[in-house]
Curated annotation (Swiss-Prot):
GO terms for biological process: tRNA aminoacylation for protein translation. Keywords: Acetylation, Aminoacyl-tRNA synthetase, ATP-binding, Cytoplasm, Ligase, Nucleotide-binding, Protein biosynthesis. Its EC number is 6.1.1.1. A motif ('KMSKS' region) lies at residues 623-627. One of its GO terms (molecular function) is ATP binding. It is found in: Cytoplasm, Cytosol. It catalyses: tRNA(Tyr) + L-tyrosine + ATP = L-tyrosyl-tRNA(Tyr) + AMP + diphosphate + H(+). Catalyzes the attachment of tyrosine to tRNA(Tyr) in a two-step reaction: tyrosine is first activated by ATP to form Tyr-AMP and then transferred to the acceptor end of tRNA(Tyr). A motif ('HIGH' region) lies at residues 441-449. Belongs to the class-I aminoacyl-tRNA synthetase family. NCBIfam families: PRK08560.1 (NF006330). This is Tyrosine--tRNA ligase 2, cytoplasmic. L-tyrosine binds at residues 564, 568, 571, 586.
Length: 748
């Protein structure tokens, strides 16, 4: 490749900022600017080059099959121009992105082979490797996951789903196509790459412009002063009429970097090249964007009777002759074939003489090009009916009395169990199954989170289970709890732990795990799992999981709310959970985990044990809400607060259905005390109930009056909460945590 000529102005120029630009900077600017069909913005590029001797330029590719000349020759020319102008070029080998986009069937080993093959071509074809770094996305992200993933999540939080969908052209898709959740994650990650690589310039194709603009918009949102300059290069069309770009899946549309001379000749011969027409003519495009920049001239050899040989120095001269008919399509094609073959010969030689390159090419040629995402939406959702059989065996396994007893304890936690036979089988075979529970630290703790969790965890540990409680701090951030402030979220998590300790949780066999710490520590295992779940589930399926965040699929969602279910599903496998013990509102994502097992043919599916959701205190409130204090009793509420809230609670006489006071007796008081004492002098005297059925019978007949029910409920709740109050009054750490939490504003 010949030296690059620089057409520089003879005098220095001045930027709008008032900065004087030297002739040297003008020269560098002209070289760098020549790379892009479009620059956003020219003044910023000049300013950057004037202030920074070695700006960082980000380029990249998905390793996805054989390399065509648009990827090969144009990238080589662009990189060589950039390094000649003093830039440091970071070439991002986007293996994880190819995986999410299901290139090569999502086979990371094959993707790695293709990446190495690309590097061999760049070397053989003349890329100047000085000031060029090839970086594998998986390696770099794994090495600095604690820096990268919070950035991805922040971008996801700050952009609506609609904004992200507008970036689908970067993957050759439209926002109206059937998308997978991975396509949403892909955009957020590519946007993050710009900042992760500390790029001053994004040098990618015009088809990547939407995500580069997203990065600039993100700078505005986070008030980052230095935005990346976008330098978008031209997209070479395919060889046939109407093909906007070369396609690996259609070999006739593209010339590959190791094509033999005869193959190049045949492809160019068959290429679309209408006489006298320049617009939409791929042969002329290749001359303009490859041959002229490479050789600085284009030589046409022909008989004297057709005008003789001619060497063109500018594209304008070529188009003038072509439009007038002086340059015939056949002569153009012959000259183009000859020039391309001259450029490609060193690559052919390298792949014939270098054994490593030869082996790589052989493997790559054997790979099938794929694009279809293997979504789990085609997998039939399993039957959700509950097996209520009281059989003492599961899958033909005879259960011991001890296993039967364990089963009854564990099963009593769940309003629903999917599936009971699987639970019996698990308890019969595994002495200490792992149970996954968790919470978003998002404000004060109400009794549904406090008392019910203590009761459930103590039951599980008494039955031999190991309980892993997932403190979902990153999830609270994704859901914009406490304004997404991780320091505040951390404070709330510590406050929750204090309450459970004071409330009587047996910490033997219980682990509290911070999501951010665990994910950062095991990122190389966790994030590929998230990506695989995302690529196997279409967007509609993930949207149906919005309920786990208290959202509906019709709401205006951020991209974070697509990432959240994929991550929560991955948590189950990261924690190696046998049982998912969460509320009924989390059921859809737990089902997603079981569907994923079916999709990847994993035999042991997590058992779903979904506990009841306590309603709010007022009529029609499906669950307690921290944002409405009148709907909830908090774990450190004073006795007077509890009494006032219960006295105002909805409690219609003789009506059991939708009666929150009776719900609290059933799910909090009876499991805690194994009895419910009602004291009443005027309404039949004192009575102790040992079953909820007896309470219901008396309430429906009117023998148990709402006023007496409420008084007994107040007393039982206050007995339960008193140790927590005492702890938060006497323990300085707990007292300080509570003061902070009470001051935090609840946000959504």
């Amino acid at each position: 490749m010949e030296a690059l000529s620089i057409n520089a102005p003879t005098q220095a120029s001045t930027l709008p900022s008032g900065l004087q630009i030297s002739k040297e900077v003008e020269k560098r600017y002209n070289v760098v600017r020549s790379v892009g069909e479009q620059c956003i913005h020219d003044d910023e590029l000049k300013d950057l080059l004037a202030k920074k001797a070695a700006p960082v330029c980000y380029d990249g590719f998905e390793p996805s099959g054989r390399m065509h000349i648009a990827q090969g020759l144009m990238k080589i020319m662009n990189v060589n121009k950039l390094t000649s102008a003093g830039c440091r070029v970071k070439i991002w080998i986007a293996d994880w992105f190819a995986y999410m986009n299901n290139k090569l069937g999502g086979d990371l080993k094959k993707i790695r082979v293709v990446g190495e093959y690309f590097k061999e071509i760049f070397q053989a074809a003349g890329m100047n490797s000085e000031n060029v770094e090839f970086l594998w996305s998986s390696d770099e992200i794994n090495a600095k996951g604690d820096e990268y993933w919070p950035l991805v999540m922040d971008i996801a939080c700050r952009n609506s789903l609609a904004q992200i969908k507008r970036c689908m052209p970067i993957m050759g898709l439209s926002e109206n196509e059937e998308l997978s959740a991975a396509h949403i994650l892909y955009v957020c990650m590519q946007c993050a790459d710009t900042f992760f690589l500390e790029a001053d310039i994004c040098q990618l194709g015009m088809d990547q412009q939407t995500v580069n603009l997203l990065a600039r918009d993100y700078c505005d949102v986070v008030k980052r002063e230095n935005k990346p300059v976008i330098l978008s290069h031209h997209m070479l069309p395919g060889l046939q009429q109407g093909q906007k770009k070369m396609s690996k899946s259609d070999p006739s549309s593209a010339i590959f970097m190791e094509d033999e001379e005869a193959e190049v000749n045949v492809k160019i011969k068959k290429a679309y090249c209408p006489p006298d027409i320049v617009e939409g003519n791929p042969c002329l495009e290749y001359v303009k964007h490859i041959i002229l920049p490479w050789f600085s001239e284009f030589t046409v050899e022909r008989d004297e009777k057709y005008g003789g040989n001619r060497t063109f120095k500018s594209f304008e001269d070529i188009t003038t002759d072509y439009e007038s008919g002086q340059l015939h399509p056949k002569d153009l094609k012959d000259a183009l074939s000859k020039a391309l073959n001259k450029i490609l010969q060193p690559v052919r030689d390298h792949f014939k003489t270098n054994s490593r390159a030869k082996n790589l090419l052989k493997q790559v040629k054997g790979y099938k090009v794929t694009r279809v995402i293997p979504t789990a939406s085609s997998t039939k959702e399993e039957d959700l009916s509950i097996n209520t059989s009281a059989s003492s065996s599961a899958a033909g396994l005879q259960m011991s009395e001890e296993a039967e007893m364990k089963y009854k304890i564990v099963r009593s936690i769940g309003e629903e169990c999917i599936q009971e036979d699987e639970l019996k089988n698990l308890l019969a075979k595994k002495p200490a199954p792992i149970c996954y529970d968790g919470f978003e630290p998002s404000g004060r703790m109400h009794i549904a989170q406090g008392v019910m969790k203590v009761t459930n965890v103590n039951k599980l540990t008494s039955a031999g289970c190991q309980v892993k409680i997932w403190i979902a701090d990153w999830f609270a951030q994704l859901n914009n709890k406490l304004g997404g402030d991780l320091e505040r979220i951390r404070v709330v998590g510590e406050y929750f732990k204090e309450i459970w300790q004071a409330g009587g949780m047996n910490n033997d066999k219980v682990e509290f795990l911070w999501a951010s710490d665990e994910i950062n520590g095991k990122g190389s295992k966790y994030w590929p799992l998230v990506m695989d779940i995302a690529r196997r589930n279409n967007l509609r399926r993930i949207l149906r999981c919005g309920q786990i965040m208290g959202r509906s699929e019709t709401e205006v969602l951020s991209a974070a709310q697509i990432l959240y279910p994929c991550m929560q599903c991955a948590d189950i496998f990261l924690l190696e959970a046998d049982i998912c013990q969460l509320g009924m509102d989390q059921r859809k994502v737990n089902m997603l985990a079981r569907e994923y097992c079916a999709d990847i043919k994993r035999k042991n599916k997590p058992i779903i044990l979904s506990h009841h959701m306590l309603p709010g205190l007022q009529q029609g409130q499906e669950k307690m809400s921290k944002s409405d204090p009148s709907s909830a009793i908090f774990m450190e509420d004073e006795e007077a607060d509890v009494n006032e809230k219960i006295s105002k609670a909805y409690c219609p006489p003789k009506t059991v259905e939708g009666n929150p006071c009776l719900e609290y007796v059933k799910y909090i008081v009876l499991p805690r005390f194994n009895e419910f004492k009602v004291e009443s002098e005027k309404n039949g005297g004192n009575k102790t109930f040992n079953s909820f059925e007896d309470i219901v019978a008396d309430y429906e007949t009117g023998e148990l009056h709402p006023e007496d029910l409420k008084k007994a409920l107040m007393k039982a709740l206050n007995i339960t909460l008193q140790p927590v109050r005492d702890h938060f009054k006497t323990n300085e750490r707990a007292k300080n945590l509570l003061e902070q939490v009470k001051a935090f504003r609840v946000t959504r």
